[in-house]
Amino acid sequence: MISDLHYGITLNKEQLEKVVERINKESPDIVILDGDLVDESTTLPQMKEAFKTLSGIHNKYGIYYVYGNHDKNNYTSKPYYTPKALAEEITKDGITILEDNVEKINNDLVLVGRADRGDGNFIRKNITALTKGLDKNKQWIVLDHQPCEYSEVKKAGGDIILSGHTHAGQILPIGLISPMLHMNDLNYGYVKEGNLNEIVTSGIAGWGYPIRTEKHSEYVIINIKNK
């Protein structure tokens, strides 16, 4: 799982190529891009460069992407690229976009990709409706950029939920304050509640500036066992 590149601000092509090289040594079956890979400061050439580079990750079953709250330039009136240009580039690079839809990977695994809750131009589906009819004997993984609605996912029968967004606080004392304000269901790390495995990554880069005083930058390798 890779999340929160915010490409062009805190990570450049050479650094991203090194990340791709390291991930390729892990021989992943599936690659999850969990949102905010680009943002309002990412130029059109940088956006194209980011996804083209990420498409070089070797995999068995594909690369899957969900939007974060920044990818579509939600916070600027003068974007460098449009949501249409973004989607076209991602698709051209062989990456599958999941936005409130389901992708069956094989006989054992299903991905449920969520629309970001901060996207005012997209009415987000109810997780129960979205997963209606899914075979509960299969293992299904929910991809949701922002760590939210975990209780609803658990009730619906989710096995794993993967999120980013928080940067684990990035700068002290944000990581201490945000859990107290209940801004997200989980700020960072791994928690198991009932049958639901919850994972929130700190992200592979920072937002706004290349500084961290909370947690480390990371990509996450997840080993999944059959039910």
Predicted regions and their residues:
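Soluble catalytic domains of enzymes that build or remodel membrane lipids, polysaccharides, and related
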Residues: 1-227
